[in-house]
Amino acid sequence: EKRVQHVLDEVELHSVSQQTIETLSKGFKRRVGLAQAIMHDPKVLILDEPTDGLDPNQKHHVRELIKNLARDKIVIISTHILEEVTAVCSRAIIISQGKIVADGTPAELEARSKYHQAVSVRLSEAYDLASDLSGLVDVGGVEQDSEDDRVFRILASDGNSIFSQVSEVAQAKHWPVTEFHVSRGQLEDVFRTVTQQTQGAE
């Protein structure tokens, strides 16, 4: 009885504890699943796609629950939702064709992305900013958004910081900037790269 009450507290189910499962929302059903999984206080918890199909509020609640559980348990998550990895994980492993092809913290994997340290720029009007950047050796290239020609990603060579250099050029050339920010990198980009390399090697 004491353990049941503790689990209800931990997964925040007291408000619906007298309802049958079929009357619960998807988010609460997911919490019931978590409650069942931790009832016997396992040291290791393995969760498969824990927020799949949930709305943003439900995702937030389940992710907070997972973080709380991870304080005294090893929690392993299998997911294809890469935002989940940055939201709750301290270590990320990418598996392709049954082999580990990447292993590190989310930040370490993001640093392997071609978009690590890239500067994203949105302009108020069309402008050829690539020609203004041709003299910067740390700029590895410029990508223009295929759907909006006012949006650019300025890529950094070898992950070097280029924000201050690009900012100076933008001010000197009077770019019509409305947004300007640096990317940490994209896990999706790293996932595609390492899994395609594995598939191409076979």
Residue locations for each model-derived region?
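ABC transporter nucleotide-binding domains
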Residues: 1-96, 101-102
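Residue-level signature of the cytosolic catalytic core of signaling kinases
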Residues: 13, 24, 102, 125, ...
